[in-house]
Amino acid sequence: MATPPKRGRLEGRVKKIAVEGNIAAGKSTFVNILKQADEGWEVVPEPVARWCNVQQNSEEDCEELTTSQKSGGNVLQMMYEKPERWSFTFQMYACLSRIRAQLKSIDGKLREAENPVVFFERSVYSDRYIFAANLYESDCMNETEWTIYQDWHDWMNKQFGQSLALDGIIYLRATPEKCLNRIYLRGRDEEQEIPIEYLEKLHYKHESWLQHKTLRTDFEYLQEIPILTLDVNEDFKGKKDRYDHMTEKVKEFLSTL
């Protein structure tokens, strides 16, 4: 069973928290709230823009892109339209882009903070055990692709696990029905054909992992990792009282780590 490796001086001082939850549970809104709540907090959003438009135009972004990332294409839409063809490609690319974003997360702001915290919008663990596993179980990845993905994921974590290991998880818990409604409201073109059955499968896996703790992983330390569950069925976007309440819950959670 894999365990988190020892960290460097700064990495050991920065608390790393993953914000997990179903599609459209409210993660992006939530991490934006956290970013504004404390000067010592930083967030790493999901790189959705790169999945929807792999080719980037800005010089700053292009300097950081690999050849595959400059090739162009909406790999998220391709996956939803033809999952049997593109699920493996998407999951490999999604995890790669997530790792690259999270490895860059310790910037000058965190180096100067007294109690630095970085919040990851999802983690490499939900990449594998929620989303990729669900696609494999739904016959959208074949046995060979799934085996290659797991082998690649294990190797990447051995190389970069020092910077990716978590101190805690915040689970934004919402029903599949509420998530489907939010998908329609936010209007992301690639997601408009997502069926409720897909969200139900993802919800079941999140519940098994973060509520019932019956989902087993290859990372032993995740079995005992502290988890804060926040019920987000009630819409909280634009509601300051809800922002304040959720922020206080997070501060209380961090104080226990």
Curated annotation (Swiss-Prot):
Localization of this protein: Nucleus
Coiled coil spans: none
GO cellular component: nucleus
Organ and tissue specificity: Expressed at high levels in adult intestine, spleen, thymus and testis with lower levels in skeletal muscle and eye. In the embryo, expressed at higher levels until day 10 with lower levels in later stages.
Active site positions: 121 (proton acceptor)
Catalytic class of the enzyme: transferase
EC number(s) recorded for this UniProt protein: 2.7.1.74, 2.7.1.76, 2.7.1.113
Entry's Gene Ontology BP terms: deoxyribonucleoside monophosphate biosynthetic process
Keywords, sorted A to Z: ATP-binding, Kinase, Nucleotide-binding, Nucleus, Transferase
Family: Belongs to the DCK/DGK family.
Name of the molecule in the record: Deoxycytidine kinase
Native source organism of the sequence: Gallus gallus
